[in-house]
Each structure stands twice: as structure tokens, then as C-alpha cells.
Amino acid sequence: MRVVILGSGRGSNAEAILKAEQEGRLGGARVVQIFSDQPAARILELGARFGVPAQFLDPGPFKTKFDEAGETRYLETLQACQPGLIVLAGFMRILKPRFVGTFPQTIINLHPSLLPCFPGLDAIGQAWRRGVKVTGRDPQSDQRLPPPPARRSRESVHPGWPWWFPTRV
């Protein structure tokens, strides 16, 4: 299966996926491309490290969504990659139904909270400031919020943990 990763930041989830591929733990799936909507994102450095093409792809002028031209640019570029799976690994853009509908049952979003709690930016920080006792991660593969419970990952929050620790559990 051909995997394309989209990310906006440092790429810790992308790195974990690439390491799993290197170790033969992806069942024959292979990452064929990394794209970022941020020209200086550290996720782009992973390409050279793991031998995967990585490039900035202009999303348009908005901070958290695509303009029409940017969405079209992404859709056409992704279609050319012929992905069997698109992983949103810290990709900080809201995808419209047109985008998701172009790749039905192909996109998975790794979101660092139990949705619908703490959507959007800084989900882990939001949960920490709220003082939650349980947090987790939701892999989304469609537009449903929250995702089906079988896909959720729950973690207890322990006193004394730094705010970012649940991202490493």
C-alpha cells in the first residue's frame, strides 16, 4: 500500500511511521511521499533521513484551511501519488467534504485528544489546563465526531506529568 503523510510541524508521528516501515512493521505498506503546508516544518527533514521525497506544498493564504486553489493543488498532487492511505500526522488544516470525498476511506487523522473534547489546535494543552483525568488519541478515518470507540486510545493522566507527556504514551 502506498502511504502519503501530510504534516505541519516537527513530524514525531511521521517519524514513528517511518521507523515502523524501516523495521518491517507496516505489513508491506510504504511511505512514498511527505508533504507539508509549512515551508520550514521539521517534518520535511525526515524525507532525507528516511529516503522519502518530502516537499512543501502551498495551501494558500489561510492559516487553518485551504483556499480553493490550494485545495485543488493538494488534491491533484495527492491523486498523482496514488495513495492507498493518507495519514494526517499533525496536519493543521481543516479538510472540507470535497477533500475527504476525493479519497473515501483513505484518510486517517491522528488527533491528540478524545474527540469531540478539545478539537483543533493545542488539544493536549487544552486537556492539561482543564485538569482532565483521562486523555487519549483519536484516529479519524471519516467525518464522524467522535470516531468509533474501537479506534480510540485512552490514557490516564497522572499528577506530576509534564503537559506534553500524554503525547509520548
Which role fits each region the language model picked out?
Residues 1-169:
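One-carbon transfer enzymes
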